[in-house]
């Protein structure tokens, strides 16, 4: 065995998933009842409304803008959130030789113009500190682009910057437009993105100044926070804003499937990674409900599925099934979940070195659509009404025209693939016509997956434009084939981590 060449882990996992996704023997079907006349509740597409991205200046790149259009057009993205609109590379703030502030919104305009031209609004994260406004010029975060995370040296100058920033946006875009944006104060101040001491008290001071100035410019501007990591500080933040009468229009916080249980929940419970994000969302939803401002919307402004370290889960089709489960479990507890990120034009750790490195995004470097892109695309097809259903592996929805759209999945954690197996569901329908044909689309090892074609061409570190086009062609989802119901039932086999979307006409 030692004489055989070693496979990269992403290749090994892909092969293992493919093997366990094969149907060697037909498993017994598990019955799922689907009643087309069941009670319904609204299903706003909270999982696709907003995405994160690489920092502000990257939005000027051609590749970023192409990817933004793809995600907007195929997935329904309406807002994007990114760091560092105030970073020195954007050129917003300077001081003259007398220490007077000098503002320049040229790049800000190009950044926001580029988003709006593509049908996407900014979810404005107000960060980071311009160096000449920083109380501590050495408070540099270790990200590749070296942002300053210090509090301001002078709150009068910070207030003036916030006032000028807000006034400029309103003058350029109009209050009817800017009032549809959101302004989030800072990013993860409870960890190393904020150098204030003590962290919470100094962040609250920053928030108070920022929120009051924005509202003074125009009360229609929407501002919120605390934008914390691992779902921290929400009760304290809402108690503070209520006690000090500080404006707040929404709550934002973060939580990843990779966050530890102890950090996110303060306990030593055994909570699987697949359950952590929605459990954290439910926790914060309850904290808001118990606060002095219980009606505030909740925006989960960073999250992602488990990375499984070197298994590179975010590069394979695991994401589609994991996302479906999160939609199933998080529905009703959150207003928007901002998947981090929509593409891999992203430089927190430096310049991307190869397309499939486990990056956060739906689109790999160069514009290669990853399986996660196709997973989101399929789930975009769900209707806007959810039908009551007790199954843990189905989401049953209805579109405005009456068509049923059902998501079904077989989620197996990547560190348990060897124990996973295909499963067969028999969907038994009531309230639909006998003998109708349904359409089935899916993502799995063979559908919506560029990795086999990438390996076949030698896994190029720098694929050419022709190779990228070939990869995107190879991974395109095929036209679904109609399948006729038998006695108002449908059997569908789901290999490991397959996501299937079933479209059922009711007229």
Task: Show where each model-derived region lies.
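Bacterial N-terminal signal peptides that target proteins for export
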Residues: 1-12
